[in-house]
Amino acid sequence: MRNTEKQDNLVRAFKSLLKEERFGSQGEIVDALKHEGFESINQSKVSRMLTKFGAVRTRNAKMEMVYCLPAELGVPTVSSSLRELVLDIDHNNALVVIHTGPGAAQLIARLLDSLGKSEGILGVVAGDDTIFITPTLSVTTKQLFDSVCELFEYAG
């Protein structure tokens, strides 16, 4: 079997496993892939694949924190229904804070991270349902707040 075939098979198996929404740790994913015949897989490779495919940790139907893939792979766009996941946007003198639905913060943060410094975003930190955004020196927190509100069509 060629390397590209092996890689394609690994990617298919990886995506299939994540669709099951039952893996709470990278170690569990490694074990499942080894069980499917990918003996050379390790935690480092799984970590890179999770990042590459935009996997996030969210709660499944049993309320367990598990890895899953966003519906559309790659960097999400504002034209997707992400704006519906934003519940509240606020700011103070230092940060812009976004509150999202449960498990949605990492997906929204990924979009914001992709915009980067060109939009005045120095950094983004996301939890399960809360995102902190720090502006660059060239942008005030109020300007960043207004920009983020416009991005998600948030009227407050």
From Swiss-Prot:
The protein, known as: Arginine repressor
Pathway info: Amino-acid biosynthesis; L-arginine biosynthesis [regulation]
Gene: argR
Lineage: superkingdom: Bacteria
Organism for this UniProt entry: Vibrio atlanticus (strain LGP32) (Vibrio splendidus (strain Mel32))
Function noted in UniProt: Regulates arginine biosynthesis genes.
NCBIfam families, per the entry: argR_whole, PRK05066.1
Gene Ontology terms: biological process: L-arginine biosynthetic process; protein complex oligomerization; regulation of arginine biosynthetic process
Keywords assigned: Amino-acid biosynthesis, Arginine biosynthesis, Cytoplasm, DNA-binding, Repressor, Transcription, Transcription regulation
Cellular component aspect of the GO annotation: cytoplasm
SUPFAM superfamilies membership: C-terminal domain of arginine repressor, Winged helix' DNA-binding domain
Stated family: Belongs to the ArgR family.
